[in-house]
Amino acid sequence: MLTQIINGRILTPQGWLKDGSVLICDGKILEVTNSDLAVIGATVIDARGMTIVPGFVSMHAHGGGGHDYTEATEEAFRTATNAHLKHGATGIFPTLSSTSFERIYQAVDVCEHLMKEKDSPILGLHIEGPYLNPKMAGTQYDGFLKTPDENEYIPLLERTSCIRRWDISPELPGAHDFAKYTRSKGIMTAVTHTEAEYDEIKAAFAVGFSHAAHFYNAMPGFHKRREYKYEGTVESVYLTDGMTVEVIADGIHLPATILKLVYKLKGVENTCLVTDALAYAAYEGNEPID
């Protein structure tokens, strides 16, 4: 099926395009042109001045539509994923919060099943925790927090290939062995919920930590201990060339001035915008969510 979208502000790598059109065939973009002349055989959609952008890839989202991916049920996965699809995502990496390994295995089974479906928007599983610094736990449930245990993560990663990213605190005992192993499996490993300073971040990057999750949040910046001043995790990540970052760019988790600083120092190629969405995202019900 051929579809032509006209009369919208089109975002391209070169900037905004007006009075152009986007030609789509079977869900794939064929062409972006500066002409809005009708294409023979195409169904025309009038965007009525709205913004036209490529589909988003949601790389850090814990849930949506009233469900959390950590529920590890097919209903939760489908409902949360559909909530994000309705708001512009075309691909998603469902994110688990700190939980038991029994629940992680259940989520893996669900994820693998759904990824086998034709044109599945689920691209792989993302795990945050449970190997987190309890001092920096934030909203992560501390009842599951622990240090990395190879007797847990190696059997899991030998069993499945659906896990594409795993975030932990790099200063924990065993974190470096964890990162070396996940890197050998092609899994992106990120620092998160951490108070690591420069030497720890530098060492973590060397063994495979390549990304900083929800940059600035759940990690300290420049600080003072007695009369001495120290760089925090934030400055350490800035100083680590090659380490990418993600920011929750909702204007609440970080102010616009900090977002500008991230853009200036890390650049567009090393910065991702994420929602870190919870079950409440795109929830249309009236009842509280458990």
Annotate the PLM regions.
Residues 15-24:
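A conserved glycine-rich beta-strand in the N-terminal activation segment of trypsin-fold
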Residues 100-106, 171-173, 186-198, 248-265, ...:
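Active-site glycine- and acidic-residue-rich loops that bind
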Residues 127, 135-149, 155-231:
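Divalent metal-binding pocket/active-site signature
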Residues 81, 105-112, 153, 179, ...:
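Generic structural signal for well-ordered alpha-helices
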Residues 200-290:
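Active-site-adjacent C-terminal substructures of enzyme catalytic domains
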Residues 62, 66, 78-107, 120-133, ...:
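Divalent metal-dependent hydrolysis catalytic cores, especially in the metallo-beta-lactamase
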Residues 73-76, 107-110, 149-151, 227-233:
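Charged helix-capping and loop-helix junction motifs
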